[in-house]
């Protein structure tokens, strides 16, 4: 029982230490950052943010390959797939049982 209390006290102490080590800001106080963290030269624009690229470059034929993705059947739930896997298991099961009966 004493060991449980010791562990609980240690966990509470660890929680207090973690909470107190977090930076404390007063209401309305805005945290400041180092200027070198946001170097303008190191920031790169997003590839789609370029206004020079128009929608005329979009090729809808690229989507045709995946057009039936929401309605395509899952091969894992395909009954033919399940029948094939069941017959494979049944075919291997008699072979294993016949080798046991030979002994």
From Swiss-Prot:
It is found in: Secreted. The keyword Plastid does not apply. Residues 1-21 form the signal peptide. Female salivary gland (at protein level). Not detected in female midgut, head, carcass and male tissues (at protein level). GO terms for molecular function: molecular function inhibitor activity; toxin activity. Increasing concentration of NaCl decreases affinity for thrombin. Keywords: Blood coagulation cascade inhibiting toxin, Hemostasis impairing toxin, Secreted, Signal, Toxin. InterPro entries: Thrombin_inhibitor_anophelin. The keyword Secreted applies. Residues 74-77 are annotated as: Blocks active site cleft of host thrombin in a reverse direction compared to substrates. GO terms for cellular component: extracellular region. Residues 56-68 are annotated as: Blocks exosite I of host thrombin. Residues 24-103 are annotated as: Disordered. Interacts with human F2 (thrombin); the interaction results in thrombin inhibition. Does not inhibit host coagulation factor Xa (F10), factor XIa (F11), factor XIIa (F12), kallikrein, chymase, trypsin, chymotrypsin, elastase, tryptase, cathepsin G (CTSG), plasmin (PLG), urokinase-type plasminogen activator (PLAU), tissue plasminogen activator (PLAT) and matriptase. This is Salivary thrombin inhibitor anophelin. It comes from Anopheles gambiae (African malaria mosquito).
């Amino acid at each position: 029982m004493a060991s449980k209390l010791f562990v609980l006290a240690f966990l509470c102490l660890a929680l207090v230490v973690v909470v107190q080590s977090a930076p404390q800001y007063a209401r309305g106080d805005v945290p400041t950052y180092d200027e070198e963290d946001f170097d303008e030269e190191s920031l790169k624009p997003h590839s789609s943010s370029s206004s020079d690229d128009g929608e005329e470059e979009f090729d809808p034929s690229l989507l045709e390959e995946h057009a039936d993705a929401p309605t395509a059947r899952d091969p894992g739930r395909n009954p033919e797939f399940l029948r094939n896997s069941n017959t494979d298991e049944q075919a291997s099961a008699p072979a294993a049982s016949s080798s046991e009966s030979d002994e």
